[in-house]
Amino acid sequence: MTSFVSVDRLSGLVAPGDLVVVGQGSAEPTALTQELIRQRHAVSGLRLFVGVVLSDTFDPERTDGVSFSSFGALGNTSRLAKAGRVDIYPVHYGALPELFSRGHVVPDVVMLQLSPAVDGAGMSLGLASDYVVDAARKARLVIAEVNRDTPWTYGGELPTDLRIDHYVEAERVPVELPPARCGKVEEAIATRVAALIPDGATIQTGIGAIPDAILTALGSHRELGIHSGMIGDRVADLVEAGVVTNSRKSFDRGLTVGGLLFGTKRLNRFAHRNRALRLCPPSHTHGAQVLASIASLFAINSAIEVDLTGQVNAETANRVYVGGVGGQVDFVRGANASQGGRSIIAMPATARQGSVSRIVAALSGPVTSLRSDADLVVTEWGVAELRGQPLADRARRMIAVAAPEFREELARAAYGMKT
């Protein structure tokens, strides 16, 4: 039976050595997580599985005695990675629920955020329909923060088989992620990407400066659709401007589909009881069969570096995790399988104030996306079309979209390449 619990008692509910899975992003139940961290010394061997972290809850300087794991170093999880404090599971986001449902990762406690019941409808998952649900089905103990300021979302209805053991009540603004500031480089990339996308296409993109710039650049398009893992404020802008109608989607017609809402109060107001917005689990947002069935799916992802053959590293820089496998491969392959779909890797040509080329002869980190899946690579300098091209032509096309000061060096490297 579900019972109210005071946050002061959290350390008495969590056993030594427990693995606690917590909601991610804006769906982090901060009333619970912040108190758990405050009480961390009362629970020896405390382990936390976190996702995309937007809050400051898990700052490395305030989490001594706690070990962390995640599927990437996204958001503020990168602080833990930089400090050598997080163990990474290199898993496709679409397969992440299976880590828990198949017993590869065994959760003891799950802490999640819910929206209260409204007008006879049950509680809602609110801001995230994700792997936390699968973890909760396997956990010994499930504790919910029922937050009055969390939007009630369709598709996010609390599953009837999900047991909530304890809950706390909260009334606080969920963790916010404001739209990113975009500079001239991001705007140049966005202009090139927008020119590739036809009216009526269905868009997948992430969060951050380049995705936000691309969504802004799509402001003159018509009848676009959205099917994405993450949805932010810029998607709400396009819906309210009449650019996104979802009217030409071949799957989930009329619905903006996503798994996570990462934005501000403006996005939360847009999402609350919006029948045209549907939150779905990773099996739907990232499922291979679902994505392949969406005609004209344009998947837009980014990279830390791309080599001359089209291999993508979206995980590490200088041997430190700063990204993750995430949903990139799910969407790259889904878009390639979509009728009329395209996969786009959009990134600046350089890093570190222009001192390092992101287009490289050989990756310095892991291969996240294979060259056999490569389609379009876009930088501020141009568009490299790699699909259907042999290696020598790929190298020439990639060099052409590199920053000019690095092209000669890349050409020399390409001349000596055998594979």
Regions found by a protein language model. Name each.
Residues 1-419:
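Conserved alpha/beta enzyme-core scaffold
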